[in-house]
Regions:
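Acidic, proline/glycine-enriched N-terminal capping motif
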Residues: 1-88, 93-95, 214
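Conserved, structured C-terminal
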Residues: 1-21, 25-27, 33, 103-347
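Glycine-rich, Trp-frequent "lid" loop and neighboring beta-strands that shape
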Residues: 99-100
Length: 347
């Protein structure tokens, strides 16, 4: 298995290590519940250095990205901002989801999921070639995510001023962006490994709780954030994955990969919904969801530490209404449908 440069640090802190897409990563450090609650109420630090970082080089980076992605990078060029977007194939299917960061000097950085890194490198390089844009995979970079309502207290000494959501601060080869995967105020730090170790040691010495993958999953589910490979893949489009808002058609003359195919699929009969239940039992991916006049399937499910009930996402027919059901261990469970962001729908 591969390991991040902080592997020994995780073990020293009591991390329970598991195989995650070929990487030895901490599932938790003793209590998933405590880690989840710490991020919701205070602050926590994640090592997400298994994710893939690609830096671009060349004069036509903007042109390349405008063709590569359905979301339009032009809206952040020159603004020290970050932008979320799916990356599509020519049929409009989702190859991955990623964040693009503007680094200054007309240069961009892409961060994508770890399980798709090799596939993404090949795809990015292929699409970039006609634009004469280089794609540099940064295999030796550190990515830390400092997340939680008190995260600013621990990052303020490293940034010149407060930065708003989806903003980027890039100085001395350290990029700090106000992005994250928890639904809380937070910052993601990308730098070389030596600096990454210094950041990690600083936060841990100041009693910031390390957070494992288990809490990361429950946090993102509560916040309504999709997990690629679980809630969406190449068989899905943004329209049936609750990210149709990323398809930017404001510039009618702009072409992008999958545009024509999406025109034919924009009236998808399926949508990604949230569900919750007061009954016991966690519905996992693959479970069938039934409602009057249709059906669907669970993509993600968990017990919510914040709301003390079982929640999840399901891909269902648009006519699903407000109530559905599922069967768990031969017992019928009543489900209530909602939007996928439970921090909004259940607050």
């Amino acid at each position: 298995m591969k390991a991040t440069y902080l592997n020994s640090k995780h073990k020293d802190l009591g991390g329970f290590m598991v195989d995650f897409s070929g990487w030895e990563m901490p599932l938790h450090y003793g209590s998933q519940l405590n880690e989840h609650t710490e991020v919701r109420t205070n602050v926590g630090i994640f090592d997400v250095s298994h994710m893939a970082v690609f830096d671009l080089d060349g004069e036509k980076q903007e042109d390349f990205l405008r063709f590569l992605l359905p979301n339009d990078i032009k809206k952040i060029n020159g603004q020290n901002k970050a932008m979320y977007s799916p990356m599509l194939n020519h049929e409009g299917g989702i190859l991955d989801d990623l964040i693009v960061y503007y680094l200054g000097n007309k240069s961009f950085r892409i961060v994508s999921n770890c399980a798709t890194r090799e596939k993404n490198l090949s795809w990015l390089s292929k699409i970039a070639e006609p634009f004469d844009v280089g794609v540099d995979f940064k295999s030796d970079y550190s990515i830390l995510a400092l997340q939680g309502p008190n995260s600013h207290k621990f990052i303020k000494s490293h940034i010149e001023k407060d930065i708003s959501k989806f903003s980027v601060h890039n100085v001395d080869d350290v990029m700090i962006a106000s992005t994250g995967y928890t639904g809380e105020l937070g910052y993601e730090i990308i730098c070389d490994q030596e600096k990454g170790i210094k950041f990690w040691n600083e936060f841990i010495s100041n009693d910031v709780q390390p957070i494992g993958l288990a809490a990361r999953d429950t946090l993102r589910l509560e916040a309504g954030l999709n997990l690629y490979g679980t809630d969406m893949d190449e068989t899905n489009t943004p329209y049936d994955s609750n990210i149709g808002w990323t398809i930017d058609l404001n510039d009618k003359d702009r072409d992008f990969i999958g545009k024509n195919a999406l025109e034919e699929k924009k009236d998808s009969k399926k949508i990604l919904k949230g569900f919750y239940t007061e009954e016991r039992g966690v519905l996992r991916g693959g479970a069938e969801v039934i409602f009057e006049g249709g059906s669907g399937v669970v993509t993600s499910g968990t017990w919510s530490p914040t709301f003390k009930k079982n929640i999840g996402f399901c891909r269902v027919d648009k006519n699903c209404g407000e109530i559905g059901s599922a069967v768990l261990r031969d017992k019928k469970i009543t489900l209530k449908f909602s939007n996928t962001n439970f921090l909004e729908s259940l607050k």
